[in-house]
Amino acid sequence: MTEQFQHRARKRFGQNFLHDAGVIDKILRAIRAKPEDRLLEIGPGQGALTEGLLNSGAQLDVVELDKDLIPILNSQFASQPNFNLHQGDALKFDFNTLGAEPRSLRVVGNLPYNISTPLIFHLLQNASLIRDMHFMLQKEVVERMAAGPGGGDWGRLSIMVQYHCRVEHLFNVGPGAFNPPPKVDSAIVRLVPYETLPHPAKDHRVLERVVREAFNQRRKTLRNTLKLLLSSDEITASGVDGSLRPEQLDLAAFVRLADTLSEKVLTE
């Protein structure tokens, strides 16, 4: 980077810039971008992945919040015809403005860890536009996404991500791959939205409500955590044992509870 464009990572943006060439290459090989792809990179930072993505020949839109990084990115990539830069907050970005076909967007990002979970929920609201997503995240977050029922990692994030997507924990990345090094390990995850949901709920917003309510007090039984939404009899009628704790239920069971609540709301 030239002296003119020196940039320090900003703590308030959760910035840790990827610089390890071996890790960058491994990520690019996992993505396998092709010229016909439509790519969206969130938080390109100083462009560690951007160059390799552009070299694939694919159309690349990037969304960057930090205004001070805009001239750095433009100086490196603005001359390339397949590069399009959007300065703004990815949490507020309207993905429909990209004009992408359904299930065509391939989303990539070394996501700031302080906004990774809300950003993923924002992306899941646009899952119909997305073909796949490859993210660098805190390792602990990836483990929660990929978790199964019965353990401490299984929770709201696991259930709602797995409702929409197939989850693959690809590989881990140590702190030394970044500048400055974060205090935690990182991991690359691949999320592939389902064309047909394996466990479709009547209303996914009701499912979100049930899951959120259940895990607000995850050490209590379902009949206690859900008592404001469903009676003990209604939980049993859903084919669920009300004496279980939320972490003991799989996705299909939560969908049944949500559908019972949806029917209850309609009849009241």
From Swiss-Prot:
Record GO cellular component, one term: cytosol
One Pfam family this sequence matches: RrnaAD
Catalysed transformations (reactions): adenosine(1518)/adenosine(1519) in 16S rRNA + 4 S-adenosyl-L-methionine = N(6)-dimethyladenosine(1518)/N(6)-dimethyladenosine(1519) in 16S rRNA + 4 S-adenosyl-L-homocysteine + 4 H(+)
Binding site residues for S-adenosyl-L-methionine: 16, 18, 43, 64, 89, 110
Keyword terms, alphabetized: Cytoplasm, Methyltransferase, RNA-binding, rRNA processing, S-adenosyl-L-methionine, Transferase
Record-listed E.C. numbers: 2.1.1.182
GO molecular function, a single term: 16S rRNA (adenine(1518)-N(6)/adenine(1519)-N(6))-dimethyltransferase activity
Main location: cytoplasm
Subcellular location(s) per record: Cytoplasm
Protein family membership: Belongs to the class I-like SAM-binding methyltransferase superfamily. rRNA adenine N(6)-methyltransferase family. RsmA subfamily.
Protein role: Specifically dimethylates two adjacent adenosines (A1518 and A1519) in the loop of a conserved hairpin near the 3'-end of 16S rRNA in the 30S particle. May play a critical role in biogenesis of 30S subunits.
Xref: PANTHER family: DIMETHYLADENOSINE TRANSFERASE (PTHR11727), DIMETHYLADENOSINE TRANSFERASE-RELATED (PTHR11727:SF7)
Name of the protein: Ribosomal RNA small subunit methyltransferase A
Source organism of the structure: Pseudomonas syringae pv. tomato (strain ATCC BAA-871 / DC3000)
